[in-house]
Amino acid sequence: MDIQKEKKKDKQHKTIILLLLLLLILSLCMTIWALFFRESVPVLAPDYAPEIESRATQLDSDSSTKLEAPPGGGAVSLTYSKDVSVNLSDKKIDLMFANPAKSTADMVLQLVIKDTVIMQSGRLLPGNKVTSLDLPDGVENQLAAGGYDGKFVVLYYDQQSGEKAMIHTEIPVTVTVTES
């Protein structure tokens, strides 16, 4: 009788170990997929300038003259802060980014965290700035409270034709995300 009980216990132990190993392998496969094969969906930069940013405000007393630009080229000047705050409950992004009046191009600002575009502004005309933008719907589910290394990606557009320039600028920023 004792031998049968021991065989039954051995069989149960082997079954449990087999199930645990199977669960471990499944967990490893899911982790590898999540880390290496899942792709984030990037926001494409428009080829032609989008609508003018509705939350942009005029810069205070920017009386500088336009920068000189070669024919067919452009010249830009940037004013920005490297600190960005995201409030998940208000769905607001607080930042400081300006396209000074001396620039010769319109700009579109993107905030990127871990290769995911978190926000894209409308077109910023020379002489305008933004200090607060709305967080797009659904982005609050992708972020958790804490600090992130991010970047501003600045896209340039010709003022006359609205065509996107072949160059862009990437600026490292520190993003602080809060719940309230």
Regions found by a protein language model. Give the residues of each.
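Primarily secretory-pathway and cell-envelope proteins
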Residues: 17-108, 160-180
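Exposed aromatic-hydrophobic patches
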Residues: 129-139
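Conserved aromatic beta-strand anchor motif in extracellular beta-sandwich/beta-rich domains
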Residues: 109-113
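Solvent-exposed serine/threonine-rich low-complexity stretches and specific carbohydrate-binding patches
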Residues: 117-126
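Short glycine/proline/serine/threonine-rich loop/turn segments at secondary-structure transition edges
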Residues: 139-149
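N-terminal Lys/Arg-rich, disordered targeting/topogenic segments
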Residues: 1-13
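Beta-strand-rich extracellular modules
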Residues: 151-159
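Generic structural detector for well-ordered beta-strands
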Residues: 123, 134, 174-176
